[in-house]
Amino acid sequence: LYHLPPRALPSIQAVEGGAVGVEHFNANGSADLGVMQINTLWLGPLSQVIRQPREIIRRRLVGESCFNIIAAGAILRTYLDNEKGDLLKAVGDYHSHTPALNLDYRRKVIAAAMRLTTR
């Protein structure tokens, strides 16, 4: 759908550790929602693209795994385009634009991808 490598989203999900119904509240007042732990900062952009109110988008991200994963794919694709095709930078951006946090997250996702290939 978004021309992403097949293990990209499953590897991110393995690191995020989210699930249907999960909301993780952050110190900055935002929350991470559902299977892919999509941050509430994305509610506005997703609402504009999908043309649904933010509250409906939020409920769907929390309660509908397929919707959540599709949204995560769109987010990763956005970052991949922003990073001119650099998948590792895009994966790090999915978590944080702070360099140290970005790099640490990339390492975790690479490790998760390696585990997925050895199953």
What are these regions (language model features)?
Residues 1-119:
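Catalytic glycan-binding domains that act on GlcNAc-containing polysaccharides
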